[in-house]
Structures are given as structure tokens and as C-alpha cells.
Amino acid sequence: MENFPTEYFLNTSVRLLEYIRYRDSNYTREERIENLHYAYNKAAHHFAQPRQQQMLKVDPKRLQASLQTIVGMVVYSWAKVSKECMADLSIHYTYTLVLDDSSDDPHPAMLNYFDDLQAGREQSHPWWALVNEHFPNVLRHFGPFCSLNLIRSTMDFFEGCWIEQYNFGGFPGSDDYPQFLRRMNGLGHCVGASLWPKDLFDERKNFLEITTAVAQMENWMVWVNDLMSFYKEFDDERDQISLVKNFVTCHEITLDEALEKLTQETLHSSKQMVAVFADKDPQVMDTIECFMHGYVTWHLCDARYRLHEIYEKVKDQDTEDAKKFCKFFEQAANVGAVAPSEWAYPQVAQLANVRAKDDMKEGQKPILSSIELVE
């Protein structure tokens, strides 16, 4: 196993944060905790329901960790939407993370997908059944164009996860494969479209800006995620089908060359994102900027990405990139480092146990006769 290229990662991260002029001022600490708890509480009750517990069959600790990660992502990044929208998006994106971490073969449950869809029957695949049930709660926040993007992108995501089940990084020489798979499973259009709820934006009035934002966000969001998650995925056996690793296989280049390719594309996308919307509707630009800064804060602060390990490793180094990275990390931590104990309560498993006990008590009640009911 190669050693992690720490110096290169520091330089790349610093350039990215400088390009987007990182300065997360989306919330006060009190507002952040309030929104985190609201979104978490609604989502936790959703996943504690018996139907969700029975059909998802996810380890309770993994489900808890997934929910906390996604609530953080949504609250930090979708800073302009309502708390209710944050909660519904948190549920939707938690479903996607659960699927992303799954190793089940979807083939048997997808044999009748279109027939069931056309006939209005419940899907055989439990994930689709649950996601479809929740979709109306998500789509009620958006106009028809944004809604179509959310639906289509979610379908693409499912297909991308299906492909990943084969741990296939592409054939050498298949240069289009890495980006094809990353666009498929990146949820870029879903994310890009879900920034524009109808209570804040008229999608007909802002159609051109929204369409462009969806197009730009598709690459920016997934590439930033690939860069910021490169450290955690570097030596994780479950994460070897990443964009960078697929570049290595398909383009037949070294790991350093693949990382440089991703870096250059991410930095170019960041420049475009800032430049394209600089003179557009101020509300649109503000929404995009808040998303970008919040999305970076989430990556720097969420334990899933382990970037605190990089910080601890380099905080005493005297190089310019190390000092800049540490300054950005501390800046993010000052606004975004909120312990889950302050907002992620009660645990999903606790809520599920309470529901199970209540159901047992309900089942033990004596059945009253019709005469007793009248009396």
C-alpha cells in the first residue's frame, strides 16, 4: 500500500478553499443546533417506525451514524431552506446513504420494476418501496421541474450503486467509464435541484439559473466530495471503486496523476461556479455560496471523513500549506464542530424499542364485545 500523499492533499485542499473564498457564516451556534435537532428528531422518528426497521434491516449503529452524517450535511449545506424541508431531505438522503453502504444484490427484486411502476403496485425492492412512500414528502417542497430532477437523479443513483456491487473500476482504455459511474451515483442533479424550494424560488422565473446550477453542481459537488473523502477512502477496502482509483485503472495512469486530474477539474469547476453566478440573481448566488461553504464545513467537521487526523498530523508543521490548512480547519471547527450529544437525541434504536413496547401493550389489551362498547 502506498503512503498517503499528505503534502499534495494539503495543497489541493488549500487551493480549493481559497478559490471558493471559504468563510462559513451560515448560522449562529444556536441556530445550527436548533436546525440540527429539528431535522434529526423528525428523521429519527421516521426510521424508528416498525416498517422501516423491518424492511431496511440495517445495523442500528450504522443507521444511527448514517442519519447523523446526513443531517449534518443537509443542515450545514441547505442553509436557506425551511426546517421542514431540511428534515424531509435528511430522510431522503439517509435512504441513499443506506443503499450506498449495502452489499445486497438488487437483481431479483428488480425483475418487475417497470411493470410494478406502471401498474401502481408497491415495488418488490424494499428500498424503493420505502423511498417511494417518502417521496411525496420531499416533492411537496418543489416545483415540477426540480421534482423531476430529484426523481431522475435518485433512479440514476440506484443504478450506480447496482454497478458498484460488482466492484468494477472499468476496463483499461475506457476513459469515459469513471465519470459515467461518478455522475450516475453522485446525486448531483438531485442535490442541485433540491436547493430551490418553491416557497423561496419561482422555478419558471429562475429557470435558466436553476438549470445552470443543476449542471454546474453535478460535477462540483461530487468532485469536492471525492477530494475531501480521498483520505478516508485511501486504505479502506470498501472504498476502492472511487473516481480517483478508476482514473488509475481506465486511463492507465499513476495515483498521483489521477489525483492531479481530479484536482484540476475540481478547481476549474470551483472557478466556474463562482464566476458564472457572480452577476446573476443575488438570491441565487447567495444560495449557491452558502451551500458551497456549508458543504466544505460539513466535510471538515464530520467524523466520517476523519480530516481531524490530518489536522493533528500537520498542526505543528511549518510549511505554508500546513499552516493554511490548519487555519481553515480551525475556522470550520469554530462554527461546525457540534457534538452529536447536543442535537442527535434520542437514538433511533431507543425510539424503535419504545414503539415496539407500545405495540406489545396495544396487542395485550382485552377485546371488548359490542355490548361492552355500547355500555
Swiss-Prot record:
Entry's Gene Ontology molecular function annotations: trichodiene synthase activity
Keywords for the protein's UniProt record, in alphabetical order: Lyase
Pathway per its UniProt entry is: Sesquiterpene biosynthesis; trichothecene biosynthesis
- Which SUPFAM superfamilies does the UniProt entry name for this protein? Terpenoid synthases (SSF48576)
Swiss-Prot/TrEMBL catalytic activity: (2E,6E)-farnesyl diphosphate = trichodiene + diphosphate
Provide the E.C. number(s) assigned to this enzyme: 4.2.3.6
Whether Lyase counts among this entry's keywords is yes
Kind of enzyme, top EC level? lyase
Task: Say which family it is in.
Answer: Belongs to the trichodiene synthase family.
Other notes on this protein?
Trichothecenes are sesquiterpenoid toxins that act by inhibiting protein biosynthesis.
Role summary: TS is a member of the terpene cyclase group of enzymes. It catalyzes the isomerization and cyclization of farnesyl pyro-phosphate to form trichodiene, the first cyclic intermediate in the biosynthetic pathway for trichothecenes. It serves to branch trichothecene biosynthesis from the isoprenoid pathway.
Query: What's the name of the protein?
Result: Trichodiene synthase
- What is the species of this protein? Fusarium mesoamericanum
